[in-house]
Amino acid sequence: MTLDELKLQVKKDLEVDDETLDKESYKNQELYAKYLDHKTNFELLLYKAKGDYKILFKDKWEYYGGKADAKIYVSKPFDLKVLKTDLNIYIESDEEIIKLEHKIAYLETTIKYIDGVLRSIQSRGWDIKNAISWKQFEAGMI
């Protein structure tokens, strides 16, 4: 699931039907569980991506430092001698490293978005309660 798909789903799920406020209040727990599950899945993807990043960083450090297996240099030659102080420049500008950093940032952004959704679901109950109270007031019950 992408962030855009998640946003569309949230927009649909958080709509409140003014005519069935009683059912909407019960729906909160289901929604909270649903988005908590999404958050857990994205957090697991984030942990995996961070682990992949560490492995890739080590591989790139060996590659640019001249310590990688000879087979790697046959398939992907690198003829420069890089100083230890310059290793980070080469590693941080490597396309694979940048792609993985973008993936990590995307997952972190998605998790922050889901945290906001979870807060909205919690406040949704309060909003529904206020709407019910307002309807009672309008009907002269309060």
What are these regions (language model features)?
Residues 1-142:
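Charge-rich amphipathic alpha-helical interaction elements
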